[in-house]
Design a protein with these regions (language model features):
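Non-catalytic, surface beta->alpha helical segment in thiol-disulfide oxidoreductase systems
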Residues: 81-118
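Local sequence-structure signature of Cys/Sec-based thiol-disulfide redox active-site neighborhoods
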Residues: 24-57
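N-terminal post-signal-peptidase region of extra-cytosolic proteins
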Residues: 61-68
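Solvent-exposed, acidic/flexible segments
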Residues: 40, 61, 99-103
Length: 118
C-alpha cells in the first residue's frame, strides 16, 4: 500500500527545487560606477550596501576616457544599472559633481527591475 505522506513530501521537495531554480535564473543586476580621481570627495560610498546586485565595478573616467565616451558619461559620479547586460537606469551627479540620487532611490530601481521579471 502506498503512503500518501511520502507523495506529499516528494511533491513539496520538487516544488521547492523548481522555486529555487527559478530564483537562480532570475535577472542579473550589475552596476557600473563612474567617477574621477579629482572628485573622490564626492564618491558614492554606499554602493556596497545595495542588495541583489551581482557585481559593482568602478571606472575612473579621467584615466579611461574611452569608457567615458562609450558610456556617454557627462558628469561624475554616474551610476548605471544594467539588467542582463542592458542599461536600464542611470543616476548622474548635479552641477556640483555630487550624486543627487540616494541609496534608497537606487535600491528602489533595482527592486523594480527584479520585480518586472515576475
Amino acid at each position: 500500500m502506498e503512503n500518501p505522506v511520502w507523495k506529499t513530501i516528494v511533491m513539496c521537495l520538487f516544488v521547492l527545487f523548481l522555486l529555487c531554480a527559478s530564483l537562480n535564473a532570475a535577472s542579473q543586476i550589475t552596476i557600473k560606477n563612474f567617477n574621477a580621481g579629482w572628485n573622490k570627495a564626492n564618491g558614492v560610498n554606499w554602493l556596497g550596501k545595495l542588495k541583489d546586485v551581482k557585481t559593482i565595478s568602478y571606472t575612473d573616467v579621467a584615466k579611461n576616457p574611452e569608457a567615458q565616451k562609450k558610456y556617454k558619461i557627462s558628469s561624475v559620479p554616474t551610476i548605471i544599472i544594467f539588467k542582463d547586460g542592458e542599461e536600464v537606469a542611470r543616476f548622474q551627479a548635479d552641477l556640483s559633481f555630487k550624486m543627487v540620487a540616494t541609496r534608497e532611490e537606487v535600491q528602489e530601481e533595482i527592486d523594480n527591475q527584479l520585480m518586472s521579471d515576475f
